[in-house]
Amino acid sequence: MTLFVPFVLAALALWASEVVADEQQSARISVTGPLTGIDRQTGAAPARMNINDMWARGGPSWDLYVLALAELQAVDESDELSYFQIMGIHGLPFRGWSDVGQVAGGSNMAGFCPHSQTLVTHAIQIAQQYASDKAPTYRDAAEKLRVAYWDWAAVPSLPEVITLENIGVNGPNGPVTIRNPLHSYYFQNYPFTLQYMNGGPLSKQNHSTRCPTKDFVDDVAKYNTFTTVTSFQNMETDRYTSTSFESPHNNVHNTVGCNNGSMYDLNWSAFDPAFMLHHANVDRLIALWQAIYPNASIFNVVDWAGALYGTPAGYVSADTPLKPFHDDGGGYDGFHTSRSVRDISVLGYTYPELQVQSGSGSGGGNSSNSSQSLSPDELADHVRFMVNALYSNLPPQGNDTAPQLRSLAGRLRGMDRVPTRRPHATRKTWSVAISVDRAEVPLPATIGCYLGGEGQQEEQVGRMSLLAIPAEGVTHSSIPLDTALGAVGGLDLADAEEVAGYLNQTLRFEMVKGDGTPIENIGSIPSLQFVVQDRDYTPRENDMEFPTYGPASARKWGRRHGRWAMSD
């Protein structure tokens, strides 16, 4: 959905946020983003941090993050700034928030579908409880605290720290072990009496649930979105034929939630603490994409969206109010819009890859290092380098392997060698494009793509996840095949006919329902299409450029003469 991305940008500001509210809780709450920790000289905002890095480093920021989240989850659920009510903006319990109720034409069986929370205020209050010799350090950490993100694009498995039921931190009175607020949320109003929350399997659980520790199928879909998609609407939604961040986003929901976990059911998903870590990363990936393509950094089309609690079905644009998120000036009709939150710094945060380290680039933590003095082209070069280092699965081409030592800031100062251009031979890259009308499939569902020749173990090489909403509309996804094909000994990826012949013998698809039950005879689904594509691919010439791709040659996959095969 087109509003998905701006909702993330606006609502995530609440996770580590200051809010402006009247004394009456039912009155307007303005979302400003955190106002603390801003560098007074440069105006640069602190960066959100990778949850794995925060846990590994420990220290005041980690202590306060865990303690503040635990305190937030303990706030009475009747409070509009409680964990329950803020996370409830997304789906259940389907009611108003911040004086915004259901609008005429809005759905009474849907939430607002954004993502949000508060944290900094709790952290500052906790920091004041530490002994006088520690208080300044903890106060500084509290002011710079921002929500963490889980970079599932780089490490496709649940962070170990969120699988621990209990966790130890240094509290104001010394070391303490508490119930891990990143593991699950325990509902205070269980057994549920609220309308819509007292039915279904998840209503039988007094806390959010998820799969056991589970690795995902790793692919380069996220890298391909950076390198091949130059249109905002194509990047952020799976309604178009190109690859997008929406597809891996959906895969994370289904994989973390399994068949009946909180993340699998979008009405309940926001209550799982993994939800915010997940969507903070989606926000981060989009922010990096926007830095690379600054002239396409917001959608400029009018698109159709289904009814939500605060939004009737109809056309939406970059100026559509993002209810229920009131702004503090600059939005439309008192609300944030996609246009007003395009620059994430106005909401008081940034990401490490958008910070250009000064000097040797050996900075750390979430301290502010401004990139505001760079031109858009220079920042794009820097972010392309970071994306290549993180997601291309290829080593840097220069001598310096540490990305921070090869930062753009250092290069501009003459401290780093400008990477030399190395010509590379063009080869083929392979993928499968999948499309289906959701109205023809029992939702939620997952389409799996498998490869395995005679005498080889069949392996899943990718999947397309269809969430429960929206209930209709054509969805697209693209599954890269290069990694799997590259592992096949003796297969020449540059020979299109040889690869096509191999795929005819080894490629298989299946579709399963939310409970894991296979959907039989998927060939009878009228809109379901599988298209094998090959394109000429020229690797990047240096670390600040992306590879280039030629036009796609398409081979439709279908049943012919009683078996599945590709057309010529």
Question: Predicted segment positions?
Answer:
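C-terminal accessory segments of proteins
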Residues: D22-D568
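Fungal secretory targeting signals
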Residues: M1-I29
